[in-house]
């Protein structure tokens, strides 16, 4: 698996390394992860993580989904797309826990498909 974050790209070949990678928060107690297997970049998981929460996007050719969290409070949550402080405001309705994000990434690592344990909204 190719894994990219605030610090650059690495290759990951075992699930324990993936879990360790997903715990990295090099700036603002946050990170933006891109996980893929192909040079083309698809399918991919794109994860905005901050503290113990995340928003997960699944993208493949012709289909895009975003995680659906348990909050119906509306509003937005600030995440970061880089170490320079580039901010991204994402809907609180899409926020899932760190544990849910890790389980989704582990399933993606194993299957190369959209993780089934998250609820998704099609974009």
Swiss-Prot record:
Query: Any phenotype upon disruption?
Result: A double dddA-dddI deletion has a 100-fold growth disadvantage compared to wild-type in competition experiments.
Report the superkingdom from the record. Bacteria
Entry's Pfam families?
A: Imm1
Tell me, what does this protein do in biology?
A: Immunity protein component of a toxin-immunity protein module, which functions as a cellular contact-dependent growth inhibition (CDI) system. CDI modules allow bacteria to communicate with and inhibit the growth of closely related neighboring bacteria in a contact-dependent fashion. Bacteria that have this module inhibit or kill bacteria without it, giving them a growth advantage. Specifically inhibits the toxic activity of cognate toxin DddA (C-terminal 163 residue fragment) upon expression in E.coli.
Assembly notes: The toxic domain forms a 1:1 complex with the DddI immunity protein. This protein blocks the active site of the toxin.
| UniProt protein name | Double-stranded DNA deaminase immunity protein
Organismal lineage: Bacteria, Pseudomonadati, Pseudomonadota, Betaproteobacteria, Burkholderiales
